Amino acid sequence: GRIGRLVARVALQRDDVELVAVNDPFISTDYMTYMFKYDSVHGQWKHHELKVKDEKTLLFGEKSVRVFGIRNPEEIPWAEAGADFVVESTGVFTDKDKAAAHLKGGAKKVVISAPSKDAPMFVVGVNEKEYKPEYDIVSNASCTTNCLAPLAKVINDRFGIVEGLMTTVHSLTATQKTVDGPSMKDWRGGRATSFNIIPSSTGAAKAVGKVLPALNGKLTGMAFRVPTVDVSVVDLTVRLEKEASYDDIKAAIKEESEGKLKGILGFTEDDVVSTDFVGDSRSSIFDAKAGIALSKNFVKLVSWYDNEWGYSSRVIDLICHMASVA
């Protein structure tokens, strides 16, 4: 899917990780090449010439990447391809038992690119230091949790969060419908994406309590799916323990964005809109002009994220962190 392809794009642009193999049981190698090369959101791939060497090998410039088309994860020969880390981005194998099938093929670690009900969840910049080498299967949480958690961490560390509600205004994704169609578990989710604002559930705010235990039970939220193809925005409305002016809050976020959270949390005072963040690799970019305070204890904070590119960048960051700890 899109995250798998974009994780591959991110990996190929970085020196600290090597892409050695991809698995997709549903498409041919030449179609895989086409899907990788042309992207309606992120544009054409321009970094290496991409060629099909044969049906089991892609060439990115001189670099060869093995291609598998195996449906059952335990049959994929990851070890033979030299893969240490597998990114499980099908959206199907999101619990530990299912994702563990990759280990049977010789992978050493599996990173699930979705929230997981039972795998340890990590948000880079927030709790990745709690990763231990004995964890073989981990989750990179969701794109929205990756946007919300760094912001919530800064606010909670500096001012304390009594409680909060989050809304994400979220671009459409592949699970939605182009025209009205059946969606048994989520009736609204079956409505046409291109001209509806669709209220939806999200576990992203509650999941912050898993990566930041101090906030467990203090946050919840919902989503509106809107007809944009990429980039989403979190609205976090919180009650603060310590009184703070909006300028105090801005200053704290700016300081963290230039310090420990540089590259993860951004800060802007420009008059930005969503397309300004297409291709932004940061998890969360605080929009200082969009937020507003009602009082010294009650404030609405707004933060943007490229829910595809930013998230895919964090998948690779998490892998690099895991490798450094091993």
From Swiss-Prot:
NAD(+) binds at R2, I3, D24, R71, N307. One of its GO terms (biological process) is glucose metabolic process. Its EC number is 1.2.1.12. Keywords: Cytoplasm, Glycolysis, NAD, Oxidoreductase. D-glyceraldehyde 3-phosphate binds at S142, C143, T144, T173, T202, G203, R225. It catalyses: D-glyceraldehyde 3-phosphate + phosphate + NAD(+) = (2R)-3-phospho-glyceroyl phosphate + NADH + H(+). Pathway: Carbohydrate degradation; glycolysis; pyruvate from D-glyceraldehyde 3-phosphate: step 1/5. It is an enzyme of class 1 (oxidoreductase). Belongs to the glyceraldehyde-3-phosphate dehydrogenase family. Key enzyme in glycolysis that catalyzes the first step of the pathway by converting D-glyceraldehyde 3-phosphate (G3P) into 3-phospho-D-glyceroyl phosphate. Essential for the maintenance of cellular ATP levels and carbohydrate metabolism. This is Glyceraldehyde-3-phosphate dehydrogenase, cytosolic. The lineage of its organism: Eukaryota, Viridiplantae, Streptophyta, Embryophyta, Tracheophyta.
